[in-house]
Amino acid sequence: MAYRRKSAFKRAIDEDDVDIIRKLLSYKPIDLNKPGSKNRTILCRAVSMKSHKVAEFLLSNGSKMSACKVPPLIISVRNKDLTMAKILVSYGASVDVCYKGETPLLTAIKTGYIEIIDYLLSLEPSGPYPGHDMIYDKLTLESCSLLIKNNIRLDIPDRYGHTALYYAVKKGNLSLIKLLVENKAITDNIERIKILRRCIVTHYNIEVLKILSLDRDILGTEGTTALHYAVEAERLEAVRYLLDIGCDPKVLDEHSVSPLYYAIKRKNKIILDELIKFYTVEFMVNMDKRTLPLAMYYCSIDELKNLMHGIKDIALSEDYLSELLYESIKTNNPEIVSLILGLGANINKRDLYGNIPLQTAIIYQTDNVFNLLLQKGADVNAKNSDGNTILHTLAACCKYKKIKLVLDLGSDINSVNTNGRTPIEEACPCKKTIRTLISHLIIMIKKNKELIKDPLVIRSVSFINGIEYYKNIMLQCENELNELINQKLVRGYSLFDFVIEKDYNVIARFVNHPKLKVLKQTANVYKELADKNIGMSLTRYTLLERAVLTTEPYLHMLPLEIRSIICCFLSNNELEKL
């Protein structure tokens, strides 16, 4: 019997038959607010089945909307049932009722039923909150217009930090974007950045950008601007458009760099040409300070000269010049390094890491620049923050050819660093490196006997004697030099003097001496030094002989000896030009 009565109730509700409901209730009254098997009240079923008459009857006879698990007004909106919604509101349904973060207005927006949205908005709801984060991507132009018309805020970020404008940009809905932009439906600077990144970087759309540009506040965010993103993403069309509408290319982002910096970093010559006309070297030196150092590394010499046009008329700080120099060293381009040195950069100034330019050239293996720095007069005895000279660095890196070069330029082999260690002590155990260092030390001692009394020399010799392999090299050097000292070319002048001689006019006198052949055959440790001076003696002698003969028609009135003396004052290059 109870089952039949229950079935009759369901049929009456489904058929919206109030008379049957009334008869059933008069026969045996029941609790209208008691949930059924599916945890739903009779009113819930009536609302779900769009039974308007039954729902109104139930409400007038004590059914409470609060007894329903899901608010009836939300159910009616889900069903797009405007009539039911009006009935429920007439019996006190709250337009701001919320179920699991969902309000009637939010539900209406999700369904896209404009008539219900319009009706609910006429009831002055507080908004589609708290579940607004579920509807931004469901907005249509019509629903958005209604919300804006009724002053419903669309600039509150959802749980992902996005606003309605972001989702409109994501879908590429130009009409909706325009509506939101015109009504300032935008939030903080972070949201602006997300929107710009989406329409320029990740999902490029120039039409969206053009609409966003209607609100210049969106393009000119605090720090990173639309132009920064366009340049960084290499969107040439966007760059040209933004420049045409007057976007300021001199704005610095949160990293204190301008769009020009990113154009250089991307090596995009076309965009670089579009931007460069807006910049002056004064701006780059005083404001956009990271751009020129970057340009040292990425630009060609011609592009760099174009960027730096007029820089000589600007007073540059020593630190800034030093930064430019260190960046130019990394390029291994002597022309660029020469350009910076020509501006007055200190060739021996330490960088932020305490290194000197010569050491930076070794670190970055820029051999051409290393040689240029030496030619420009870099101090081979300058020390870094650890007290290491370039000789310490070269010895540790086994650069034996460069070791010979800096030793010839006067690098101090006995210099100590902050740890009290000399280049020989810091040297990597490489045969050629150790041999180069020890042979130089021994030849210094042979040239000047007083050096053996120097504490630093004593320290170096003591260190060498402490390692058998080093000691053997030292003994080999001493024996070879002693043999050279005993071989006299003339009275008071030995083969040793010939090997260490720097005056080419002197060694030219011995070009045909028979003992030079002996020197060439017997030299071992000092073979390179001996061969160099033997070759130079022949070269110098040949040039002098030819010069004397060449000048005879012009200086025939002078004795041969005088002409020879005059020619001796000329360098080899000058003699070759005669």
UniProtKB/Swiss-Prot annotation:
Pfam families: Ank_2, PRANC. Keywords: ANK repeat, Repeat. SMART domains: ANK. Transmembrane segments: none annotated. ANK repeats lie at residues 4-34, 38-67, 68-97, 100-129, 160-189, 222-251, 255-287, 320-349, 353-382, 386-415, 419-449. PANTHER family: ANKYRIN REPEAT AND PROTEIN KINASE DOMAIN-CONTAINING PROTEIN, ANKYRIN REPEAT-CONTAINING PROTEIN-RELATED. This is Putative ankyrin repeat protein FPV022. It comes from Fowlpox virus (strain NVSL) (FPV).
